[in-house]
């Protein structure tokens, strides 16, 4: 049996980020905005994941994070991939995620040995807030992103890394935790 897997760090929404997400939701029917209780920083997207590999994946996460202690990360700034002019994904940035950035190389190597392909693009700390599904009212969305480009959305204590699964539904993806690795334990 397989599931759509990924490794992530949860990010709390908070009132400022929740209000920003609500502004985006109202700005354009072309956006599919992520529920703020589902926000996360993806460390590594795995894709189709055999349930039998879960213990090895968790061991890989545990080994990669062995020296990490809980730390503070700041949710700050906005942007879009690949660019504001050609938005597919709207994101908020994460400052202070360097501890996670440092483990991505070892995770990539260990997960490649388990059959997961390496990510070709460099890792960038961000939280996906919305996906663009059409082209209606995107100028309004661009203006909102520009206004909030350096906005502080709050801080978050990173104290765990999760193996998660994603179930795609017509309303959007629903995420659940498969296993958790606590930092500093």
Positions of PLM-derived features:
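Histidine-dependent nucleotide/RNA phosphoesterase domain, centered on the 2H-phosphoesterase fold
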Residues: 1-185
């Amino acid at each position: 049996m397989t599931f759509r897997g990924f490794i992530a760090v949860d990010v709390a929404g908070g009132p400022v980020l929740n209000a920003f997400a609500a502004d985006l939701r109202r700005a354009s029917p072309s956006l599919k905005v992520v529920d703020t209780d589902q926000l996360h920083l993806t460390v590594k997207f795995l894709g189709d994941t055999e349930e039998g590999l879960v213990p090895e994946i968790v061991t890989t996460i545990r080994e990669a994070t062995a020296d990490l202690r809980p730390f503070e990360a700041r949710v700050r700034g906005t942007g879009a991939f690949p660019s504001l002019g050609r938005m597919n994904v709207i994101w908020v940035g994460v400052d202070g995620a360097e501890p996670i950035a440092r483990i991505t190389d070892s995770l990539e190597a260990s997960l490649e040995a388990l059959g997961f392909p390496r990510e070709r693009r460099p890792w960038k700390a961000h939280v996906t807030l919305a996906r663009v599904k059409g082209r209606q009212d995107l100028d309004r969305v661009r203006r909102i992103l520009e206004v909030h480009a350096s906005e502080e959305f709050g801080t978050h204590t990173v104290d765990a890394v999760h193996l998660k699964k994603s179930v795609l539904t017509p309303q959007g993806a629903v995420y659940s935790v498969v296993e958790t690795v606590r930092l500093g334990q």
